[in-house]
A protein has these predicted regions:
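Active-site phosphate/pyrophosphate-binding segments
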Residues: 158-308
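Extended, charge-enriched "interface" segments that sit outside catalytic cores
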Residues: 1-74
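Short glycine-rich or small-residue beta-strand-to-loop segments that form or flank ligand, phosphate
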Residues: 79-84, 132-139, 170, 261-268
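Glycine-rich phosphate/diphosphate-binding loops that line cofactor/substrate pockets in enzymes
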Residues: 45, 64-78, 122-131, 251-260
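Short acidic, glycine/serine/threonine-rich loops at helix termini
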Residues: 91-96, 120-123, 144-149, 179-185, ...
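Glycine-rich oxoanion-binding loops at beta->alpha junctions
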Residues: 50-67, 92-136, 141, 147-150, ...
């Protein structure tokens, strides 16, 4: 399952082999997992690699997450609205669209816009007495989720009273954030901690993705254990060609260096929504210092010769 196959023209394949040899000679896989910032600029990169170990951390904390969700469902909650922007909302939306909301779980809405029509449409679909709002913001200071939280908190006060409104809110935020402080002051149902060393677009397998996934009834343990097997495959130092992460990254990099910097995403219908998350992940991660790879999601597929 954790493998990769590829076919490249001779000039790209030759460059790939050279790149893989350099990677292996410099022991770069081991250095990556040791968070060696010299693989990049030698600046603060080591402080942003928490995603390397997050799968095991999420597995270790899964029972606690599921206990909170069980209590929520036992209290009659059947609708969840996630309020977030960018990486904090993208992964939950992909998981919902891919796996669906399971029976006896909650229905998930994702609101990542302050467009009045979108807010009204979701508002009209809710039974507030049976709804929990999940405010997902790493910094806690992102304007849009805070505006949405204020709006729906007011609506919840109207629906269930000021004393009970906070019990219909959950926060996912990094420790020490303004949202954590506000959620504690209000008495939110629960506060799930983010990991400061994980950027938003890398947070899919942390609480930002796992908590909404548990709410819709996903088999999160199976999901994370599957991810953990890929972690193991990407951690191997046996050889660069045996490491699917190194191989994929090297192919994309070699192609980009030779002018093939448009990456068309071709996805099966069942995982089509994954393209939007990959698009953000790749564009935001590689688009630095005037260079980068341009991912294209949802583009009509053409003949091979149109990709040059």
């Amino acid at each position: 399952m954790n493998s990769l196959s590829h076919t490249l023209p001779p000039e790209l394949d030759s460059a790939l082999q050279e790149t893989l040899q350099k990677w292996q000679t410099s022991d770069s896989t081991a250095r990556l997992w040791q968070r060696d910032a010299s693989l990049w600029t030698g600046a603060d990169e080591a402080e942003w690699l928490g995603w390397l170990e997050i799968v095991q951390q999420s597995l270790d904390g899964l029972n606690d997450v599921q206990a909170v969700i069980r209590t929520m469902l036992d209290d009659g909650i059947r609708q969840v609205v996630l309020l977030g922007m960018g990486g904090s909302s993208m992964a939950p939306e992909v998981l919902r669209d891919t796996f669906g909301c399971q029976p006896n779980a909650a229905e998930l809405f994702v609101l990542d816009s302050t467009d009045p029509d979108q807010i009204t449409n979701i508002d009209n679909a809710l039974t507030l007495e049976q709804t929990v709002f999940v405010v997902a913001s790493k910094s806690g200071s992102t304007l849009e989720p805070n505006i949405l939280m204020a709006h729906f908190y007011h609506r919840m006060v109207e629906a269930v009273s000021a004393e009970r409104a906070a019990g219909h809110f959950i926060a996912i935020t990094d420790p020490g954030s303004s949202l954590e402080q506000q959620a504690a002051e209000y008495g939110f149902r629960h506060i799930f901690a983010g990991v400061p060393s994980i950027g938003g677009r890398f947070s899919a397998l942390s609480h930002y993705g796992v908590v909404p996934a548990a709410m819709i009834g996903m088999d999160c343990r199976r999901f994370l254990e599957s991810a953990q097997s890929m972690v193991s495959a990407c951690k191997t130092t046996a050889g660069a060609t045996e490491n699917p992460g190194v191989m994929l990254g090297s192919i994309i990099a070699v192609a980009a260096h030779q002018g093939h910097d448009k990456l068309t995403l071709v996805l099966s219908p069942g995982i089509a929504s994954l393209g939007a998350w990959l698009e953000q992940l790749i564009a935001e991660s590689t688009g630095k210092q005037g260079t980068g790879v341009l991912p294209l999601d949802g583009e009509p597929i053409g003949a091979p010769d149109v990709y040059g």
